[in-house]
């Protein structure tokens, strides 16, 4: 890549807005019901009825194989059988389910998510990884894991944004949710978001 191309690329990055940081270290227990201090969903600030969750879709390999093979993969809980994309959407969006947080009994801060395994982009290795959302899990990547960056957002200084890359607009009707480092700037297809804790019944979730 030539020097001119590199300079142009970085000039574009510098021209875009920086994502909003959010802090989950001061979540209170008021009106939060469930195990420990409570369970709750994360709503996007300024977008009523839009929550952090997952969209599920069937891959091409699933659609082309026999019903018996597909059923066996489903029963075996194969992680890549029905890929889940972390996104933001309303409760009535098809194939969407919100991520349910559970709080720690001592601190009332987020401890784990309802789903056990969620794909995320490891910006250190540049690979897609599957990580436990539990903050205390043995197999959690303490620094690079998406879950731990969310749980300790102030310490790690992460930024959160909703993004609409070209591939997502083709296969999904909802954007991806991306985590950026504090010193990164956003691509032009990303928009900064901020999240807040909401009690599931108050948000319309049973």
From Swiss-Prot:
Chief place of localization: cytoplasm
Family: Belongs to the VEL1 family.
InterPro entries in the record: Vel1-like (IPR019435)
Protein name in the entry: VEL1-related protein SCY_5430
Keyword Transferase: no
Source organism, top-level taxon: Eukaryota
Keywords carried by this UniProt record: Cytoplasm, Signal, Zinc
Signal peptide location: 1-19
GO cellular component terms, A-Z: cytosol
Subcellular location as annotated: Cytoplasm, Cytosol
Induction: By zinc depletion.
